[in-house]
């Protein structure tokens, strides 16, 4: 709905995620509890 959210890492940190960073075909969405692979990058705030 908002176009962004947070991904929880295995060590408990929350990482900001914007929908434009989701690399998939079709509708870019993630479900709560879904396992994902990701790289953390520094960005503008």
Curated annotation (Swiss-Prot):
SMART domains registered for this protein in UniProt: CSP (SM00357)
Residue span(s) of domain CSD: 1-45
Pfam families named in the record: CSD
Transmembrane portions of the chain: none
One GO location term (cellular component): cytoplasm
CDD domains assigned: CSP_CDS (cd04458)
Keyword vocabulary terms for this entry: Activator, Cytoplasm, DNA-binding, Stress response, Transcription, Transcription regulation
Major location (coarse): cytoplasm
GO molecular function, one term: DNA binding
Keyword DNA-binding: yes
Localization terms from the record: Cytoplasm
Keyword Transferase found: no
Induction conditions: In response to low temperature.
Sections of the chain in a coiled coil: none
Subunit structure: Homodimer.
PANTHER family in UniProt: COLD SHOCK DOMAIN CONTAINING PROTEINS
Name of the protein in question: Major cold shock protein
Organism: Streptococcus pyogenes
